């Protein structure tokens, strides 16, 4: 998804994997992370709670605001985008924010904060699950992603394992550990 042109265009190469598999994996990981975070005392908002939902990007970003009011000041501390990768690899990484972002409400430290959030989560994933580190833990050159161009708070864009490789077994069997790692990484970010 490219967002820096102000309009936002999305393209997903269907040939890179089974689009019926990834949403379910991501939701399991998100629900596990939510349970862990709530156990730590955090208030968590999910953009979807079932596989039947596919909210627009505007709807997803609205969860950063009180009562989903895009005219209000954001009240979320961070936004975590949980994905699985595809295309012939193994391991976990975060997509680095590396652009010139101008959306309303962002702090001057948006890029650094977003990357630190992604790094905190990924460090936990590779140390607390069977997933390895992909690409040194960070995917550069994709800072144009619409999330980074529209999100008003620091955004961690995670690519957790490859659902079209042997990582799928880990993603299926270790969603609890992955959720705990995501929650632990968010907590690390919040306290540093």
Question: Which ranges hold each PLM region?
Answer:
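Loop/turn elements at helix/coil->beta-strand transitions in domains of secreted/extracellular proteins
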Residues: 37-45, 70-79, 128-132, 152-156, ...
């Amino acid at each position: 998804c490219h967002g820096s042109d102000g309009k936002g265009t999305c393209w997903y190469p269907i040939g890179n994997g089974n689009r019926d598999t990834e949403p379910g994996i991501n939701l399991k990981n998100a629900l596990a992370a939510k349970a862990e975070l709530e156990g730590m005392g955090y208030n968590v908002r999910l953009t979807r709670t079932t596989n039947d939902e596919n909210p627009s990007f505007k709807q997803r970003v609205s969860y950063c605001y009180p009562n989903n009011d895009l005219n209000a000041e954001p009240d979320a501390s961070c936004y975590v985008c949980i994905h699985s990768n595809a295309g012939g690899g193994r391991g976990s990484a975060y997509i680095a924010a590396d652009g010139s972002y101008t959306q309303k409400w962002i702090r001057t430290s948006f890029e650094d904060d977003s990357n630190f959030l992604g790094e905190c989560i990924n460090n936990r994933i590779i140390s607390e699950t069977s997933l390895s580190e992909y690409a040194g833990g960070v995917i550069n050159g994709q800072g144009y992603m619409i999330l980074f161009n529209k999100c008003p708070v620091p955004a961690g864009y995670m690519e957790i394992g490859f659902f079209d490789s042997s990582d799928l077994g880990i993603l299926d069997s270790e969603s609890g550990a992955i959720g705990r790692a995501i929650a632990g990484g968010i907590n690390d970010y919040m306290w540093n």
